[in-house]
Amino acid sequence: MLKLVIATALVIASGLACAAEPPLTAARYAQELGVGIDVDWARTERGIREFDPLVVRDFHAKGIRHVRIRVADEPTEARLIHLRKLVEACEQYGVIPVIAYQADEYKNDPKADNEKEVINWWIAVAHYFGQRSPMLGFDLIYEPADKLNHNLASLNRVYEKTIKAIHDIDPQRMIFIAPRLRAAPEDLSSLKLPPRSQNYLLAEWHIFPWGPLKNNGKYPWTSGTAAEKAAIHNRIATALRWQQKTGHVSWVGGWGVGESNRFTPTASQMAFATFMACELQKAKIPYAVNADFQFYDGEEGAWRPAPEPLLQVMIAPVCDKPGEKPGHRAVKPAARDAGRATPAAASTAKSAAPSGSSASPD
């Protein structure tokens, strides 16, 4: 009788454990992504050389919950080993890793051989990670642009084949696909989505990857006029309409305010950053800040002091609430563990680097 009671209790406990941990879906994954940052830990020689696992701890302490790991070169054994080191560091410190492939040759010349190269690149990466690291995401093509802007059929074909190949290896892997025109939200509707893919496929899009740069002789942001704010709001609304229509969720893979690592942020930059972050958070769209080297000195293992207030606004903005008068806002608390971690500068251990990429930051 006692054995029966124990067995029953174990079955109930097992059922409760399963009930407490629902299966990972794209919607829940998007919630977990929160605010992240684009990193060059696997793209540039300097980024590879300077990576220290404790940097991930510093990022988490600052409130960063995911990193977009940009990769430019072939998936050699050394590079795959380095990627695994990055992913393991992220898992250790509670940061979600997303690998993003630049696919430059394909973007410049979307011919059949280059299509195959992209697919094979991801097959190699997918095989290497197998079904491990369930929170690891794959961002298939970083900012589709150049000649690919004029070949939608090729882009959708590569996405279709790559998604199938990856899910033949790991059916649960979270995958991001981006539209043309450097991931413009207005082009989301051109993406060909596999049937019943809402639970594992997310869209990546973004605006202002390097801030509100001059376009056609005008800056899209000066003092934050009503027209400037409406233009940004409308682009975010375009993505929200696509989400509602398709049932898919999306992620802003990178936005910035312009060069900020050597200068004290201007009032205009702070206002722009606050508005962008608040609009995205109101829309419940996760996003990554572009980019790590603007805010973090990898060689010193410490945050750059000048742009730190700007980064804080981008991560945890103080937003007006509906019906509240502008300026009457509660201060948003910083990350709970922000003041506890010893900076990575205290660590002298550096990761061994594979043959690095000569790519420079975008």
Which residue stretches match the model-derived regions?
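Sec-dependent signal peptide recognition
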Residues: 1-7
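N-terminal signal peptide c-region/cleavage motif recognized by signal peptidases
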Residues: 14-15
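Active-site mouth of glycoside hydrolases
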Residues: 22-174, 179-191, 309-318, 322
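Acidic/histidine-rich helix-loop elements
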Residues: 35-51, 111-113, 212-232, 265
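Active-site region of glycoside hydrolase catalytic domains
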Residues: 119-220, 225-258, 282-288
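Substrate-binding cleft of secreted/luminal carbohydrate-active enzymes
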Residues: 239-309
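Aromatic- and carboxylate-lined catalytic core of secreted/periplasmic carbohydrate-active enzymes
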Residues: 241, 312-336
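Compositionally biased, proline/threonine/alanine/serine-rich low-complexity intrinsically disordered stretches
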Residues: 325, 329-362
